[in-house]
C-alpha cells in the first residue's frame, strides 16, 4: 500500500457517523461506540478512554462508553446530548475519533489535592482546560474538592478569578461606571433584581444585569424575568437593550460570560460543597466579564439560607471585597435578613406577579420585597455616584413611587423582545394552620422543595404562594400557603410531599 | 378510587421492564429512562437523580440518565452493564424505581473535605455505603480527593483500614502462620510474586496470595499470572488450591476480600492520586481479610518509581508497620532499588516469559528479577519461621536452583486450572540508541505509558521488551527496547508517543 493510501485507510479507521442518542448525561459529553467498531479495534479504545471528537471545524473531548448491543448501529458514534450540542454535526456527518491530548494541567490539580499552593500560571492552565471541556466529571470533582472549604487563600482566589475572566467574553460598555449586584445563595422569592435594575437605570446609571436560571431552586432570576420578557439574548441584543434603556435583565448562560463556571457547576450541584474561593471566583468573574465597575453584594443570613451566620457573611464579604479590589472591581456588601421567603410567590410566575405589584405601586404589593429592593437600589445609587451618600434610599423610593421605575421596566422588557402576560395555574391546593398560634419559623429549604415538586421552574406558573409571615398570628384552619400546579399529578405529588413532612410553618401556640 | 386501588396505581407508576443496554460505564450503575415514561413523570425524576432500583430481592443504587429517543422502548428501564450485573434480573423482569435513600454519610465526606478529622464511626458509615454501591462516582471522587496526600492521620488510617476489613470477607486458614507480601507502587516488570510464592510454599509455609490487576500500570501481578493460569478463582477454589499446594496467586477482586477497595479503585484509577492513608488501608485491609499474620512489604525507591526517596519510603513504611500492629498484623519492610524496570518484559505476557525463564533456571533469565525474588523470599522464610535469621536467602536459592520452586509453581498453576502457553504479538517496533554512550537513566513512568499505549494489559501479549540496563554501554543504532502490539494501530500509536517524547533512555556520551 502506498503511504497515501495507508494514510487514507488510517483516516477511515477513525471515522464514524454521528448519531444522536438523546441521552442526557447532564453536561458531560459521552460518546457511545460498539466494542466491535473499527475505531475501538484499531485504536485500542476501552470504556472511560478520553477521546477527541471532531466534526468539521468543531471538536470536543468526551468520555467513551463501549457498548455491546444492536441498538447502536455498526459504524456510528452515539452522542450524548452534551456531545451533540458541542459538535452540532449535520445528520450522518462523519465524526473523527482520536485519543484526547494529554492533560498536563492535571498535575496542578494533584498539587492542590496534596495541599500545595497554586500560582496564576497553574490556575490559567486548569481553567483553560476546564472551559475547553477537556476535564471529565471526575477531574472536575477532584479540582472542586481540592479547592473546597477555605483551601484557597487570597492570592489563589484572585488567580482563579482572573483565570475565569480570561477564558470568557469581556464586555466593554465604553462608560466609566457600570453597576451590578449579586445575591449570594437561595432565599425563595428574592427577586429584587427586577426592581433594582429599572430603579437604578431610571436614575441614569448603566446596569447590564446577567442572571442565572434555577440550579437547585424553584426559580432563578432569569426564570422569573422570562415570565415577563425574553431573556435568551445574545451579546448584540443585550448591548442594544442596554444602549437604549441603560439596563437589561438577561440569562447569563446565553452570553457565556464565564464558560469555566458553566462547566464547574455541573459537579458543584451534585457535590453540594461549600467553597469560599470558588464562590468568590464564580461571582466576581462574571461581574468582571460583564464589564461592571461597581458591584453590590447582597448576603442574606439565616438558619436555612446559604450563609447561616453573620460571622460567616462577614468573612465571605471580606474575601469578596479583597478579590474585587485585586481585579479592579469596587465591591460593597449589604448583609440582609434571610429568615424567611421574600414576597409571597415562590416560582417564576408567582414571583413575577409580586414584582409587577411593587412596580405598579399596588396596595397589596409585598412590602418586604419593596423595602429590600429600595435599600439595595439606594446602595447602588450611592455606589455609582447617582446619589450623595445617605440619600440613595430616598431617591430610589421617589423613582419607584412616581412610576419612572415602572416605565423603565416596561422599556427594558420591550427592548428585550416585549412585555408578556403572567400565566396562572389551573390546579391549586391550600395548606392551612393545624392549630392557632403565631408563625415562629418557616423552613425555606422544604418550602422550595415543595414549589419544585409542584413543577417550578419547568412549569413557570407553578410554585407556592405564601400567605403568612414570621410573627403573624394565625387561627386554626387559616391558609398558610397555596400550592400551584399545571397538572393534577404534580399537585398531588407536591401535596403528598407536604402532608408527609413535618410542618413547613412552625406555629408556636400562644399561652 | 379506593385507597387500595390508589396504592396499586402508585406501585404500577414506579415499575418498568428491565432491559440490558450493554453500555459499559466502567463500574458506575446507570439506568436509562425515557423522559416521557410514567416513572419520570410521576416521580419528577431528572437526569442525575440517584435512584434505587429493585428487582426481586436484589437492589442497587444507580444514577439516572434521561433519554429522548425511540431506541429505548416505552415502559423499559435500560440498564448499564454494572446495573445489570448488580440486579441480575430475569429478561423482562419488573424493575421498581424510587428515590435513593438519603446518604447521611456524605456529611462525613464533607467534613473531611473541609479539613476535619473523622472518627471510626464516620469511616464505618462512609465505607459501608461505598461497599454497598450507594456512592456515585462524583461522591467517590470527593472522598478519595479529601483523603489524598497525607490528609489521614494514624488513627484515621487505622479506622479506615478496620472499616474496609469489616465490610469484606475474612478468610481463616486454621494455621498459626500465614505469610504474605506486597510491593508498593509501580516498577515495570517487577513480578517477584510469581517466584516468591512457589519458593516459600515449597519450604512448607502457607502463602495464599491475592494480587491486583493493573490499575494505572501496564500489568498487575494478576494480569501476568493470568497469562500462565486462571486467576478468577472464587474463595472455595482458592482454598482448594492453597490446601493442595500451600500457595496460590489469584485475583483479589474475584474473591472480593475488600469490596470497598474494589469500588474506590474505579475512581482512583482515572484520578491517579497518591494517598498514603488510602494506600495503607487498601494494602493492609486486603492482607487482614486474606487471613495473613506476617506481611513483607517491598518498597522500591527511585526517581520515577511510586516512592521517590528513602525518607518517603521510611515514612510510608512506619505507617504500614503501625497500622499493621493496630489491626494485628506483623509487618516487615524491605526498601529496594527502584531505579529501573525489573527483568526485560513490561506487559503481562512479556513478564510471564521472564518469570518462566527464572523458574526454569534458563541461562538467559534476567538476573535482577531472580536476585530480587530470592531476597524477598529469604525475608519471608525468616519472617515465617521456615529459616533461621540470616539463612533465608540461601534456602530460597537452593529451592529455586534444584527445581522445587518450578515444580511447586506448576502444581499451583494446575490447581488453579492449568498451566497455559505464553502468547506473542504480531506487530513490533525496535527503538534504537540515537548516539553511542552509556545508559544513564530510564524513565519508568514513560516506559510504562508506552507499554500501555501498545495495548497492555488488555492485550496480554502487548508491551515493551527492554534490551539495555542502566550502566550498559550502547552503540548508536543498538536496540534499546522493542514495542509489542496486537494491532497495527496500537503499535503506531505507541511508536508515535515514543517518537514525540524526550528519549525514555538517557544516554550519556562517553568522553
UniProtKB/Swiss-Prot annotation, chains A, B:
PROSITE patterns: THYMID_PHOSPHORYLASE. GO terms for cellular component: cytosol. Belongs to the thymidine/pyrimidine-nucleoside phosphorylase family. Type 2 subfamily. GO terms for biological process: pyrimidine nucleobase metabolic process; pyrimidine nucleoside metabolic process. HAMAP family: Thymid_phosp_2. Its EC number is 2.4.2.4. Pfam families: Glycos_trans_3N, Glycos_transf_3, PYNP_C. Signal peptide: none annotated. The lineage of its organism: Bacteria, Pseudomonadati, Pseudomonadota, Betaproteobacteria, Burkholderiales. It comes from Acidovorax sp. (strain JS42). This is Putative thymidine phosphorylase 1. One of its GO terms (molecular function) is 1,4-alpha-oligoglucan phosphorylase activity. It comes from the Bacteria. Keywords: Glycosyltransferase, Transferase. It catalyses: thymidine + phosphate = 2-deoxy-alpha-D-ribose 1-phosphate + thymine. InterPro entries: Glycosyl_Trfase_fam3, Glycosyl_Trfase_fam3_N_dom, Glycosyl_Trfase_fam3_N_dom_sf, Nuc_phospho_transferase, PYNP-like_C_sf, PYNP_C, Pyrmidine_PPase_CS, Thym_Pase_Put.
Amino acid at each position: 500500500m502506498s503511504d497515501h493510501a495507508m494514510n487514507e485507510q488510517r483516516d477511515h479507521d477513525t471515522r464514524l457517523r454521528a448519531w444522536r442518542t438523546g441521552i442526557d448525561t447532564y453536561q458531560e459529553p459521552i460518546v457511545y461506540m460498539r466494542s466491535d467498531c473499527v475505531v475501538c479495534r484499531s485504536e485500542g479504545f476501552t470504556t472511560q478512554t478520553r477521546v477527541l471528537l471532531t466534526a468539521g471545524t468543531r471538536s470536543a473531548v468526551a468520555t467513551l462508553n463501549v457498548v455491546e448491543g444492536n441498538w447502536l448501529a455498526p459504524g456510528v458514534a452515539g452522542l450524548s446530548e452534551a456531545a451533540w450540542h458541542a459538535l452540532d454535526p449535520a445528520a450522518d456527518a462523519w465524526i473523527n475519533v482520536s485519543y484526547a491530548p494529554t492533560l498536563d494541567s492535571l498535575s496542578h490539580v494533584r498539587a492542590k489535592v496534596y495541599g500545595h499552593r497554586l500560582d496564576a500560571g497553574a490556575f490559567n492552565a486548569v481553567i483553560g482546560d476546564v472551559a475547553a471541556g477537556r476535564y471529565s466529571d471526575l477531574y472536575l470533582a477532584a479540582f472542586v474538592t481540592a479547592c473546597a472549604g477555605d483551601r484557597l487563600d487570597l492570592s489563589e482566589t484572585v488567580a482563579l478569578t482572573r483565570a475565569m475572566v480570561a477564558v470568557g467574553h469581556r464586555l466593554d460598555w465604553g462608560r466609566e461606571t457600570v453597576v451590578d449586584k449579586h445575591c449570594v445563595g437561595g432565599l425563595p422569592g428574592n427577586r429584587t433584581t427586577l426592581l433594582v435594575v429599572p430603579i437604578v437605570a431610571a436614575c441614569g446609571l448603566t446596569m447590564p444585569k446577567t442572571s442565572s436560571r434555577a440550579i437547585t431552586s424553584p426559580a432563578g432570576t432569569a426564570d422569573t424575568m422570562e415570565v415577563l420578557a425574553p431573556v435568551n439574548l445574545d451579546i448584540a441584543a443585550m448591548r442594544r437593550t442596554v444602549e437604549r434603556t441603560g439596563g437589561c435583565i438577561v440569562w447569563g448562560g446565553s452570553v457565556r460570560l464565564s464558560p469555566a463556571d458553566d462547566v464547574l457547576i455541573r459537579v458543584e450541584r451534585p457535590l453540594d460543597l461549600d467553597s469560599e474561593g470558588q464562590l468568590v471566583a464564580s461571582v466576581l468573574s462574571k461581574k468582571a466579564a460583564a464589564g461592571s465597575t461597581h458591584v453590590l453584594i447582597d448576603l442574606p443570613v439565616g438558619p436555612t439560607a446559604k450563609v447561616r451566620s453573620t460571622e460567616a457573611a462577614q468573612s465571605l464579604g471580606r474575601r469578596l471585597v479583597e478579590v474585587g479590589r485585586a481585579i479592579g472591581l469596587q465591591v460593597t456588601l449589604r448583609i440582609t435578613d434571610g429568615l424567611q421567603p421574600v414576597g409571597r410567590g415562590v416560582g417564576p410566575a408567582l414571583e413575577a406577579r409580586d414584582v409587577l405589584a411593587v412596580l405598579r405601586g399596588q396596595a397589596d404589593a409585598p412590602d418586604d420585597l419593596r423595602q429590600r429592593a429600595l435599600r439595595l437600589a439606594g446602595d447602588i445609587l450611592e455606589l455609582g455616584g447617582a446619589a450623595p451618600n445617605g440619600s440613595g434610599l430616598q431617591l430610589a423610593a421617589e423613582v419607584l413611587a412616581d412610576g419612572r421605575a415602572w416605565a423603565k421596566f416596561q422599556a427594558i422588557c420591550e427592548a428585550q423582545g416585549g412585555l408578556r402576560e403572567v400565566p396562572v395555574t389551573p390546579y391549586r391546593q391550600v395548606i392551612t394552620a393545624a392549630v392557632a398560634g403565631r408563625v415562629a419559623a418557616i423552613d425555606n429549604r422544604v418550602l422550595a422543595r415543595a414549589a419544585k415538586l409542584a413543577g417550578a421552574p419547568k412549569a413557570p406558573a407553578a410554585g407556592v404562594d405564601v400567605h403568612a409571615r414570621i410573627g403573624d398570628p394565625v387561627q386554626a384552619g387559616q391558609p398558610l400557603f397555596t400550592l400551584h400546579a399545571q397538572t393534577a399529578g404534580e399537585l398531588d405529588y407536591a401535596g403528598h410531599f407536604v402532608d408527609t413532612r413535618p410542618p413547613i410553618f412552625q406555629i408556636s401556640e400562644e399561652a
